[in-house]
Structure formats: C-alpha cells, structure tokens
UniProtKB/Swiss-Prot annotation:
Residues binding Zn(2+), per UniProt: 9, 12, 31, 34
Binding residue positions for ATP: 119-126
Record keywords, A-Z: ATP-binding, Chaperone, Metal-binding, Nucleotide-binding, Zinc
Pfam families: AAA_2, ClpB_D2-small, zf-C4_ClpX
Function: ATP-dependent specificity component of the Clp protease. It directs the protease to specific substrates. Can perform chaperone functions in the absence of ClpP.
Annotated Gene Ontology cellular component terms: HslUV protease complex
Gene3D superfamilies: 1.10.8.60, ClpX chaperone, C4-type zinc finger domain, P-loop containing nucleotide triphosphate hydrolases
Complex and partners: Component of the ClpX-ClpP complex. Forms a hexameric ring that, in the presence of ATP, binds to fourteen ClpP subunits assembled into a disk-like structure with a central cavity, resembling the structure of eukaryotic proteasomes.
GO process terms (BP): cell division; proteolysis involved in protein catabolic process
Superkingdom as given in the UniProt entry: Bacteria
Protein name according to UniProt: ATP-dependent Clp protease ATP-binding subunit ClpX
Database matches in SUPFAM superfamilies: Glucocorticoid receptor-like (DNA-binding domain) (SSF57716), P-loop containing nucleoside triphosphate hydrolases (SSF52540)
Name of the gene encoding the protein in the UniProt record: clpX
Amino acid sequence: MTKETETTCSFCGKSQDEVGKLIAGVDGYICGECIDLCHDLLHDEETREQQSAEEAVETEEKLPTPHEIRAHLDDYVIGQDYAKKVLAVAVYNHYKRLRSNHGIADVELGKSNILLIGPTGSGKTLLAETMARMLNVPFAMADATTLTEAGYVGEDVENVIQKLLQNCDYDTEKAQRGIIYIDEIDKITRKSENPSITRDVSGEGVQQALLKLIEGTVASIPPQGGRKHPQQEMLRVDTSKILFICGGAFAGLDRVVQKRIHKGSGIGFDAEVKGKEDEVSLTDLLKQIETEDLIKYGLIPEFIGRLPVVAPLSELDEKALVQILTEPKNALTKQYQALFGLENVELEFTPEALNAMAKKALERKTGARGLRSIVEGALLDTMYDLPSLEGLVKVVVDEAVINEHSAPKLEY
C-alpha cells in the first residue's frame, strides 16, 4: 500500500511540517512564507508606482513659464530678443501639450517644431542647448549635410534618434521628452522650385525622409547602437513627443522676402545700398517670412508644414560680440580667467583687446563661434609656459596681442 500523498505549498513546494500552516484554495495550497513574499512584491510595486507618480507631478510643477525660459536664456545668450520670445512660447506649449494631452477630450494639440533662421555664429545652437539643459531633458544634435535617405551611403535620418537614446542611456521614456537640433537645414534645399525627376540623395530626398520623423512616427531603433537585422528586438521611440529644432543660415532668403513684399515696385533688392539702418530692418524683414518664401528657397511645402514656428536671429554687431565675451554666466573671458586661476594667476583683458577680438570675428564672418579660436590663439604660448613660470601673478592681454600677435604682458 502506497504512502498517503503529503500536502505541500503549491508555490514553493514545502511540506506542512516545514512551514507550519497551509491555506487551502480551490486547486492548491499556499504557505505563510509565500504570502509574506507576495505581500512584499506587491508593496514594492506599489511604492515604485507611487514614486513615479510623485516624480511626474514634481516634473509638471517644474515646467517654467515663457517668462522664466526667456530669463534663463538671457543669462547665457546675448541679444536675439525676438527669437528668445518665440522659442520660450513654443517650448512651453510643447511640454504643456505632453503633460496635458491625457486630459483633453476631442482636441489633439499639434507639435510646435521650430525653424531657426540666422547667420553663422548668431546663437542658434546655443539657444537649443541652453533650453535642453534648463528643462533637464536629453539633447542630440545632427548636421543635415551628413544625412541621406535610407539605403544610401551616409548617415540614416533615424541615426538622429539613436544619438538621443545614447545620451540618455537608451531610456526610451526620457528620449521621448528630448530635444533634437538639426543644423545646416538650409543646405538640403532642392536646387529649383520644380520637383526633381532625378533622385536627390542629400537634398529633397532627406527632407522627405525627415518628414515623418519630425511630424511623429514610431521609429524602430537597434539597441546599443547595433545594426538592424530581422531577428533583433528593437527599441520603439514615439517621435511625436520629441521637440525638433531645425536651424540654418539661409543666406539670400532676405532677398526672396524683399522681392515678394516689393513685387512690381521696380526696385531691386540688390540695387539698394545697405547702411547700418538697413541692417536693423533686415531682422524685421525676416519676421515677415511666409511659406512661399521658404518654398522658393528650396524647402518642400510638406517639410515647411512640419516646422510651424519660425524664429529669425539677427547678425551680431561689434557691441554684441563684446558682451558675449564678458557678460554671460559662461562667458569666454570668464572661462579662461577660471583656467588661469587654477594656476593662481590673474588674467586681464583690456577693453581695447575685447573690441579688437570682436572686430576680428566680424571680419572673419564667423560671429560668436569664431571668438574662442581668437582667444585661444592669443593665449596659446602663455598657456604652454604657464605651469613652468614660477612667481607669475598676472597676465594682461591688450590690443597689440590681438592685432599684432604680440606676447601678453606678464607681471611677477
């Protein structure tokens, strides 16, 4: 005769002798130890959900107003008041949309992707970077001239999403709240207003490839930067939640706008002699940009439709460049002074030197971007010798250092 079957816990398999009590269910038993374990697991899950909810509420509370966004941009970017205001409103509306969509019935809020138009070194990239840093969201940057359609040699447009994922350790939720800045967007314009019969791999074709990405699609991205293959599990990223900012110099676009405004007046834009007063009006001219102007320039209508917010930036003058050198929180002169301070040496730039640097940047037509190379060139030899110079107290950079490549004055 066989031994009577011993009653055991259906979860852990322990006998009644080992656990003391078993609670009977319809088709099985559970012991006190397993009940405690289940309770702990459920409690941990509840705690995690509560923490996530609290973090979400905390994040929502931290969404800065357009005034606060503008004030923060003022700390790091000189001038460009109109562009800052446009950006502040667009960014606020975008993140408000993400946080409020679940509570809006029968209304779908559109995306506020942004097009920045301004000359080299006017602050387009800095504005985008500063906003991402302020909002504490992932940021990625791409150069439109390196992008090609899928299947061609070059960088696939979806690689832009991969860069964003890399910058937030492949956390898709974080990536979907990020900002992507695509520079040199004016370099992928088509060469004529008529659709091309031949394939345009790096121009109109790239605009077409970017369309869905910018408007909103679910992109499949290989994990950890691998290549796509059929059996691979992909990361799915909803790009409708990502804010896209496109920037470009759009040289000559002002002529297109001027031609439209003064159509039939018989006065050619090229015939005008532009003085200082006219230069101010060029910024106002770019505020009047319409879709037809961008189409004439070479952007396709569908692409323009995905960038509803247009923010023009003005060219920086000498005064603005001097302010950029000295006033922002991370101003170039402050950075180099901090660097010299690590060697217990004071670094001084004379007002004449600052003006000379600004003039040189204007001559090179590099805007604020060219200032760092000018300062670096002026201080290279001094920085090379600095750790070896005992007793050095102060370094003075004057106008001669910038214009005549003289050595800075050393004070011991």
